[in-house]
Amino acid sequence: MMSILLMILGVTIITLSVLVNQITKNTFTKNNPNLDVVVGAKGSPLQLVLSSIHHIDIPTGNISYKNAKKIMKHPAIKFGVPISLGDNFQNYRIVGTDKKFLKLYDAELEIGSMWEKPMQSVIGSNVANFTKLKIDKFFVGSHGLIDTGDIHSEQPYKVVGILKKTGTILDNLIITSLDSVWNLHSNQNDIFKNSDSLEITALLLKYKNKTSVFSFPRLINKNTSMQAASPNLEISKLFKLTG
């Protein structure tokens, strides 16, 4: 009898393990909006992918926005979306970016409007539900990617839009302009006088065609101070390691 119970328990554990693994794979798949490559500061390519697309790790550092704009104009690139990380509100990450970021997820507004100037924000459905933020409400972000209480009290964000649920990581994000993030982390009097000093966290890229899948990352990794990482390749490696 005991052996039968142990066998049933073993099968149950295996089944649950497979189920959890499958759910995790599905989540990673949904969170990547068919991006081909991520460019960011040198370090762990997996860390770069996890932090920039799945928002479950810390970034590898920052890169020059001036250099990022050059990469977006490369003949191999169809489009690029810059992102800047570093702050949160109640543990929900604040992402500085442009409006192409929302198009990656086919995002639609539930209520309100898109941001039009610095310190305006659009929030995901889960953020709205759990923080109780509403249109025209103000909030202040905290330094870092987890809530430490070290807040930017001098410059609050205003909620101007709430997104419809997407079933992706976007539901857990607060989206604003790059200018908003730069304003908070730089000397505002000098920020736009010296655009060469502006930085972002990463660049999310889509190729014009798949022939660039090997040549473009090699170009970035060998000839620049940045790294290029394939989201699909890094997540595939992760699941091979974890079984």
Language-model features: locations:
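Mechanotransmission and gating elements of multispan inner-membrane complexes involved in transport
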Residues: 153-156, 162-243
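Active-site/binding-pocket entry motifs
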Residues: 44-46, 100-101, 165, 234
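Conserved residues at the C-terminal ends of beta-strands
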Residues: 83, 142, 206
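Short amphipathic alpha-helical segments
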Residues: 35, 119, 199-203
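Hydrophobic alpha-helical transmembrane segments of multi-pass inner-membrane transport and secretion
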Residues: 1-24, 239-243
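Hydrophobic secondary-structure segments that place a key small or acidic residue at a functional site
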Residues: 88-99, 107-188
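Hydrophobic, regular-secondary-structure patches
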Residues: 14, 18-93, 103, 117, ...
